[in-house]
């Protein structure tokens, strides 16, 4: 995590930079430091639901500022104990094959190459914890699985995932086979990494060994669908910030206050370092399908919650369709195409992505970048500053149901020549923040 500092508004005056002066911005030390990520659900992305239908969208995604495209699982889906008519993407029948719904391996290679031509990265979802019940491993290598008292395959304990069989990582042959499958997509298709499903359910020592092996082949980007410093120590570049998601949902419901967010950030800072990237999001495939759209969960606070997620230290995620204001729960086991319309929110998300790309104070990996929480007299204002020697970004978020007027913004450490980032204007004499919205100022 970035350095976390609490400062008081009274007397907290900072020197400002003239708006006519160019801000010196260096290149990040690694491409991931100012990267952004976009989750793509191949089945629901287009009417055909295949790889070829993604190609016309790539230049649009590039223009939005997307750096990493994450494809949900691309493998054949098991038929035994299948849920719904199409099944769960996370019930993998063969780790080295392509789901025929999506196309073939040649189509996939064209997609990978096209993404690389636009200087973007592609990672694919990987389900290492379990397979479908009709995966060939279940008959050829039954000892690779967790068996019940009757010597039968079983789903992961404590779940209703009756369509998948739990794997047993005490078996070294399984470990070798899984790493071999991970290497396959890097060696044969030149993908750039993996998003690893329920990563905390797979032993850390396996991940450490596997990721070390993968990185001998390529500098892959590894995302864990879990949180914990142990996963970063095992080699993962980024982890889900589920804790933040839960706190933000509770704040939206009125069950928690902004002090809960303060507490969470303090805990985060005590656990993670500047190279441990945390992924922030307002929605993803799980939240959308099972818990409700971002509009359902956040209600009136949708915009302020979005601004918060996109300005936190870490990396922001967009789930496909958000740029069109997606407000329906996509069915998980059936075809349910996204209604794209006119991409009504695309400019909004493009600005938020570009904020992170172009401002070095928003980058990861720099130990000299500081996150300062700004104290103020406004109970429902969550204010903070991210800065380094070249760049300063101040974020003011109004979680109140009424607009907020700030007459003396210099008490918040904002300079008179600061730029209102979203509106592209010099800061006015009096700041007016609409209800459940925010302001971002660049020095």
How would you label these PLM feature ranges?
Residues 2-7:
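Sec-dependent signal peptide recognition
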Residues 428-443:
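C-terminal beta-strand-rich structural cap/linker in extracellular carbohydrate-active enzymes
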């Amino acid at each position: 995590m970035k350095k976390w500092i609490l400062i008081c508004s009274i007397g907290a005056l900072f020197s400002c930079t003239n708006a006519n002066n160019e801000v010196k911005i260096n290149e990040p030390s690694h491409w991931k430091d100012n990267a952004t990520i976009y989750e793509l659900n191949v089945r629901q992305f287009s009417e055909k639901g295949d790889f070829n239908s993604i190609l016309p969208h790539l230049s649009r995604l590039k223009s939005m500022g997307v750096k990493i495209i994450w494809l949900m699982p691309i493998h054949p889906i098991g038929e035994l104990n299948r849920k719904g008519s199409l099944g769960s993407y996370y019930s993998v029948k063969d780790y080295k094959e392509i789901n025929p719904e999506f196309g073939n391996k040649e189509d996939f290679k064209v997609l990978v190459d096209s993404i690389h031509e636009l200087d973007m990265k592609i990672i694919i979802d990987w389900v290492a914890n379990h397979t479908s019940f009709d995966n060939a491993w279940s008959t050829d290598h039954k000892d690779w699985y967790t068996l019940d008292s009757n010597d039968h395959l079983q789903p992961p304990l404590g779940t209703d995932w009756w369509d998948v069989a739990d794997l047993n990582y005490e078996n070294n042959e399984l470990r070798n086979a899984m790493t071999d499958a991970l290497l396959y997509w890097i060696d044969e298709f030149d993908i750039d990494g993996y998003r690893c499903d329920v990563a905390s359910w797979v032993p850390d020592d396996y991940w450490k060994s596997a990721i070390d092996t993968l990185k001998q082949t390529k500098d892959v980007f590894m995302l864990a669908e879990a949180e914990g410093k142990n996963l970063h120590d095992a080699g993962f570049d980024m982890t889900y910030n589920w804790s933040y998601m839960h706190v933000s949902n509770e704040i939206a419901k009125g069950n928690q206050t902004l002090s809960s967010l303060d507490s969470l950030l303090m805990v985060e800072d005590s656990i993670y370092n500047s190279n441990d990237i945390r992924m922030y999001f307002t929605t993803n495939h799980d939240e959308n399908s099972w818990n409700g759209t971002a509009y359902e969960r956040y209600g009136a606070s949708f915009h302020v919650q979005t601004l918060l997620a996109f300005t936190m230290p870490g990396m922001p995620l967009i789930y496909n369709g958000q740029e069109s204001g997606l407000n329906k729960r996509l069915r998980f086991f059936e075809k349910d195409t996204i209604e794209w319309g006119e991409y009504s929110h695309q400019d909004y998300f493009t600005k938020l992505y570009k904020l992170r790309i172009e401002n070095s104070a928003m980058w990861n990996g720099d130990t000299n970048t500081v996150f300062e929480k700004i104290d103020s007299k406004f109970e429902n204002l969550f204010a903070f500053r991210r800065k380094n020697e070249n760049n300063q970004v101040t974020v003011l978020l109004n979680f109140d149901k009424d607009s907020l007027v700030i007459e003396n913004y210099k008490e918040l450490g904002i300079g008179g020549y600061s730029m209102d980032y979203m509106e592209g204007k010099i800061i006015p004499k009096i700041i007016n923040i609409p209800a459940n919205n925010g302001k971002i100022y660049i020095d």
